[in-house]
Amino acid sequence: MKNLVVLLFLLQVHSFCFAQILSDVDEVYPFSEDLAAVKKGNEWGFINKKGALVISYRSDLDLKDNFSEKGKIGNKWHPAFKDDRCLIKKTINEVNYYGYIDSKGNEIIHPQYLNATNFENGFALIIAPSKDVIGFNEILKKDIISSNIEEFVINTLGEKVRYLENPINYDSSKRKSKLPPVFHSKFIGARLVAVQKKDMKWDIYEF
């Protein structure tokens, strides 16, 4: 009887020492800024270093990091926090818009960009849609609108800190591909960005 009590006690201690925190997770990735991405079904969440799910599973977390191998395991992308920001994606009328949440899961920059990068040294690159009135149709009695995309550097509050002077004609409603438009700019230093112009030459800007 005494041996049975000791055995039951040891089993309880063993169970306590190896308590299960999270179960039925499909994918788990390394920590970035004290948070690790976990996937369950088609949704992603984040755990802290104690294994607790601190950002609940959600479907809007994006899966790419355009300019860095960080966040890539093999051929798979996963969401990751950089500078306390993580990309999210929202689809409106079959067009994807990108924004950011913070490490508490709060939406800091609402999805409004046609493409966006992860933050790096406090800044990110984004592609924003713009429309300009370039004339007036006398027959239809309506403005003639030119749809463009423009690239900017933004800070972690979503403020535009540098216009990259490379507008491109673009109409998302007429685009067959669901892939986001491609960047023609890239960070090359802490506050340096290179921009490829239409003649395929590069200009370098400080911001």
Language-model regions: role of each:
Residues Q20-F207:
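Residue-level detector of conserved, function-critical positions
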Residues M1-L22:
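Bacterial Sec-dependent N-terminal signal peptides
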